[in-house]
Amino acid sequence: MPKTETYPRLLADIGGTNARFGLEVAPRQIECIEVLRCEDFESLSDAVRFYLSKCKESLKLHPIYGSFAVATPIMGDFVQMTNNHWTFSIETTRQCLTLKKLLVINDFVAQAYAISAMQENDLAQIGGIKCEINAPKAILGPGTGLGVSTLIQNSDGSLKVLPGEGGHVSFAPFDDLEILVWQYARSKFNHVSAERFLSGSGLVLIYEALSKRKGLEKVAKLSKAELTPQIISERALNGDYPICRLTLDTFCSMLGTLAADVALTLGARGGVYLCGGIIPRFIDYFKTSPFRARFETKGRMGAFLASIPVHVVMKKTPGLDGAGIALENYLLHDKI
């Protein structure tokens, strides 16, 4: 089928909290972008139908090709979201939406593909020197959960994305303060993963743990209604609540440790890329936060890590971009 006959293509980036939808009407041209809350819809199909009804006026043709990036492992036809209530069959959903092809990929596979096509102004560099062109790239990002993937270049120049669930590795405390935070989390959960702290809910968990630290009993604290990631971040930056600043500093330090662990494991001299909606909200603070110092605090491997650049993805819709690139690869090569 000629490529022009595959447009518009239905794209989705589905996380734990929000589902983003868009229509790719031409290569890398995405229109009618909408963000829907997952909790407002009983199923993915309901959300898609609602989205398409909103875009009815701009739709000249019904999409017959779709690509959905979802924040959960893909292990066959049945998909169960990790951080929301949606479950679905890929084939049943394809039929329900009358699509010729529905590609469903992990959200951080989509993020990796998006990074392969990004321009310099889509990224904010945090330390390091230059990326090695053919070296592995590590992609991770705190959001509702914590995603991790790897982008490598094959010998023929093509790209390969390795999906993973690195957000669920066991968290390793770095110092006494992080041991305290870990102990608090361990009292609540059987397994304390990196995602427990490096996510939106993780900010709240760190705050709760620190609020019980000896010596902080009498400092100004947030009310229960104010215990949200957004408010903790805002209070941290305006300086009114030292405990919120300590929370954000601890979050960034922990992220530095994990990013370094991933970079060392992969030999990611192609760079580390931080995705997700959390860090861009406080990018100016993040540039001077404890993140980079902690990233390089790896003993004998400090010099190795000091050369690796870390980039914060500032682009608004990388998940949709990556879903579109993955679908393009599939249509051209019958693989992603």
Curated annotation (Swiss-Prot):
Top-level lineage group: Bacteria
InterPro entries per UniProt: ATPase_NBD, Bacterial_glucokinase, Glucokinase
Subcellular location: Cytoplasm
GO molecular function: ATP binding; D-glucose binding; glucokinase activity
First-listed, main subcellular location of the protein, grouped into a coarse class: cytoplasm
Keyword vocabulary terms for this entry: ATP-binding, Cytoplasm, Glycolysis, Kinase, Nucleotide-binding, Transferase
Family, as annotated: Belongs to the bacterial glucokinase family.
Binding site for ATP: A12, D13, I14, G15, G16, T17
Catalytic activity as recorded in UniProt: D-glucose + ATP = D-glucose 6-phosphate + ADP + H(+)
Enzyme kind, highest EC tier: transferase
Pfam families: Glucokinase
GO BP annotations, alphabetical order: glycolytic process
Protein's UniProt name: Glucokinase
Record EC number: 2.7.1.2
GO terms for cellular component: cytosol
